[in-house]
Every structure is written in structure tokens, then in C-alpha cells.
From Swiss-Prot:
It comes from Moorella thermoacetica (strain ATCC 39073 / JCM 9320). The lineage of its organism: Bacteria, Bacillati, Bacillota, Clostridia, Moorellales. Residues 1-182 form the KARI N-terminal Rossmann domain. Substrate binds at S252. Involved in the biosynthesis of branched-chain amino acids (BCAA). Catalyzes an alkyl-migration followed by a ketol-acid reduction of (S)-2-acetolactate (S2AL) to yield (R)-2,3-dihydroxy-isovalerate. In the isomerase reaction, S2AL is rearranged via a Mg-dependent methyl migration to produce 3-hydroxy-3-methyl-2-ketobutyrate (HMKB). In the reductase reaction, this 2-ketoacid undergoes a metal-dependent reduction by NADPH to yield (R)-2,3-dihydroxy-isovalerate. Its cofactor is Mg(2+). The active site is at H108. This is Ketol-acid reductoisomerase (NADP(+)). It catalyses: (2R)-2,3-dihydroxy-3-methylbutanoate + NADP(+) = (2S)-2-acetolactate + NADPH + H(+); (2R,3R)-2,3-dihydroxy-3-methylpentanoate + NADP(+) = (S)-2-ethyl-2-hydroxy-3-oxobutanoate + NADPH + H(+). The gene is ilvC. GO terms for biological process: isoleucine biosynthetic process; L-valine biosynthetic process. Pathway: Amino-acid biosynthesis; L-isoleucine biosynthesis; L-isoleucine from 2-oxobutanoate: step 2/4; Amino-acid biosynthesis; L-valine biosynthesis; L-valine from pyruvate: step 2/4.
Amino acid sequence: MAVVYYDQDADLNVLKGKKIAVMGYGSQGHSQAQNLKDSGLDVVVGLRPESKSRAAAQAAGLEVKTVAEAAAEADIIQILLPDETQARVYREEIAPYLTGGKVLMFSHGFNIHFNQIVPPADVDVIMVAPKGPGHLVRRTYVEGQGVPALIAIYQDASGKAKEIGLAYAKGIGATRAGVIETTFKEETETDLFGEQAVLCGGTTALVKAGFETLVEAGYQPEIAYFECLHELKLIVDLMYEGGIKYMRYSISDTAEYGDVTRGPRLIDDHVKSTMKSILKEIQDGVFAREWILENQAGRPSFNAFRKKEREHLIEQVGDQLREMMSWLKK
């Protein structure tokens, strides 16, 4: 069973007198910085001089400096920038100021696990990764609750890395819900696999295949959209709330029978074998190398994929149908 830490396992005093630099002010950056500040900690946000987020961070009462300035004065540096920019920013603006005794932190292990960032041996390297989007991390904190998180120690130069990581997790509210111990390897590989095989890649491919099957069989695209995409949220919300068993309890018996008899025919051993090969590409670093090279080349394939996907009939139909849905934000 997983090792889980809670409020009583963490001490915010570990971070007293230390300056924490949060690099980036996106989904995780804004929530973690604000939560740390409201926990009474000394926080500075590191941003590009021209960043559009500077005004928002300042409006939240946060000190804002350039990444280099923030790195120079911080004891703890949390990098919350996009995966594809972290290595360059680290190399140019953080590494020169990452002196012995400092702490380097992440909320995703990609760049450490795949050696795009190689920290010096005399710094702690820690991951605290909330398992929810930034707005939820912030909202639950304000409500006196929290979002569960993962904690991993890659390097423990000080001998106190776990204490520091747990204190940070408490500062953002995560120990209120529970913090699960993991490793950089496990977090990175499972996160990428989930995105590719299930949550993003698997789901979108399944939805499009179902939509295309109905349209090619002569059914109206609008009806196919409702049955294969729009209603997916209803099912996912039920699973999110109570697991697969709760979803099956909530749907009709006809739907449940179709689920348990037809689902395994669709997602069969062949699909599982493909999943295993996708996982192996992640474990072996094949995907990481491919993505790194794609970015270095200016993203030609990625941009072409984006353009092609946006032109799919399902997007056109969806745009039209959502105009009928007054409850959706425009």
C-alpha cells in the first residue's frame, strides 16, 4: 500500500526564514504561490519581464521578479514552467544561482527523469505534484480543504529533503487531503502513459472512431456527436464521483449489459498489447527523445497534427451544437 502523509506529518516551521521562488504563474504557479503566501511563507514569483502574468501576480499581493533575480535570492526554487521550456530556462537563468544547500522543486518529473535538467549534487531535488488543476488547488485551500498530491525525493543532499517537501505540501494545502509518496520515475512514466493511452490519446481516438463509425453508417453527424462525445461527460462524472461501480449503478440495465458484454470486445488483448508498447516507449525514453527533438525542430509534425485535428468533422459539428447549449460559457 502507498505511504500517505497528512497535516500532522508536516511542519511549516521548516520553511520559516526561507524564500520560496515559484517560477511561472500559470495553472499551478498561481495557485501554489498564493497558497504558500497565505500560509505565511515568503514567496517571490519569477517571470519573464514581458510576461502578461506579472499584473495578475502583483494584484494578488505577490512579489514579482525576473526568473534570474528570483533564483538568485531564493532558498527554494519551484519550477512550474512548461516541460518543453524548463531545461532552457534552468540552464540560462536558474543554474548560475543554484548554489549548494538550495532546494530545487518540480510538480512533474519529466526533465529530471529524462536528464534534461541535471542538478548539482549539493542541492535537494524534490517533487510535490498536486493531483488536480490549479484552480481547484486554490479553491479548496481557500475553503479550508486541499487537493491530494504526490511527493518524491530525487536528491537528498541536506538529509532533510522529505521534511522540506512535506512542509511545502502543507503550505499549498495538500496534506489536508493526503500526500502520497512516489518516485520521479513512477510519477513521470505513469503520468505520460495516462495522458497518451487513456485520458487524452485513448479517449479522443475512441470518441472519433465511434463518431466516424456512426456517420459512415449513414447516421446524422449531430446525433453521432451527442452519443459519442457530448454524453461522455455524464459517464466520466459518475466514475469521478464513485468509481466504475457507481457509474454502472447509475446507468440503465441495458447500458450496463452492453458495457460488460461489448466493452471487452472493443478494448481487447490487442489494445492492451498496444498499451504495453506505448508504455515501453515511455520507459525507454523513446517518447521523450521524440518530443525533445520535435521542439528543437520547431514542432513541424506537432503543428501539422494540430491543424489536421481541428479540421475534423466532429469539431465543426460540435461548434454548431454548442451554440444550442445556453449553460456553456461563451
